Every structure is written in structure tokens, then in C-alpha cells.
């Protein structure tokens, strides 16, 4: 189960609306387990997975993932099984209600974003349009 993590010292009245939502983004157990494994390989327990949106790709926007040990004050932080997923407010507006998952199949393994806001996606699933 994912939980929203608030910033230390932040008051609910001062928090942006998205930070007070119960589940603005779903970070699955499968994704958290893979991230935890990758963080252990890196040897830095302060790392979190950051997901972001940037212009590009064949459909106009594309997803990006990176490890980050710096959390901005306005980042959304979602925790699942002790692993943190970070999203900046600009990216979150495109990811509201989305699910970040990790899948393995005969064709390979990958992080997958199931985004209800995307009108179209490319064949590989890494870019989308609104």
C-alpha cells in the first residue's frame, strides 16, 4: 500500500492541494521492490526514484526516471514498502491518478506508467499526448 509522506514541519494549511490527496499516484509493490533492489545495488539508502515528464518522444511528452537523493519542498513523495517515489508539481499535473508499476515478461522487464490522462501513447509506451 502506498502512503503519502509529508514534509517535516509542514502544516496542512500550507501544503499544496495535491499533497493532501489520499492517492494522487499509485506506486505498486512490484515497482517498489525493483527500486529497492536497485538502490541496494547503488549502496546509497538515501536515494528515491523520481518520475518526471518532459517534452519529446513521438507523441509530444515522454516519461523519465532517475534516482535522486534531493527532495524539493514542493515534491510529492509517495512511499511503498519503505521506498520513496518523487514527483515534481509540474509533472504531477500530467500524472494525477496514474500508476507506476514494474513488469517482467518473456520480452523483457521495464517500469510502466499507466496514465489515465494520456489520450494517445506510442507503441513502446514511453511517450504520450494529452
From Swiss-Prot:
Binding site for iron-sulfur cluster: 58, 122, 124
Highest taxon listed in the record's lineage: Bacteria
The protein's required cofactors: iron-sulfur cluster
Keywords: Iron, Iron-sulfur, Metal-binding
Entry's Gene Ontology BP terms: iron-sulfur cluster assembly
Entry's Gene Ontology cellular component terms: cytosol
Transmembrane segment boundaries: none
UniProt entry tagged with the keyword Iron: yes
Co-factor binding comment: Binds 1 iron-sulfur cluster per subunit.
Similarity-based family: Belongs to the HesB/IscA family.
Keyword NAD included in the entry's annotation: no
Function: Required for insertion of 4Fe-4S clusters for at least IspG.
Protein name: Iron-sulfur cluster insertion protein ErpA
Short name of any one Pfam family annotated for the protein: Fe-S_biosyn
PANTHER family for this protein: IRON-SULFUR CLUSTER ASSEMBLY 2 HOMOLOG, MITOCHONDRIAL (PTHR43011:SF1)
GO molecular function, a single term: 4 iron, 4 sulfur cluster binding
Assembly and oligomerization: Homodimer.
SUPFAM superfamilies per the UniProt record, alphabetical: HesB-like domain
UniProt-listed InterPro entries: FeS_biogenesis, FeS_cluster_insertion, FeS_cluster_insertion_CS, FeS_cluster_insertion_RrpA, HesB-like_dom_sf
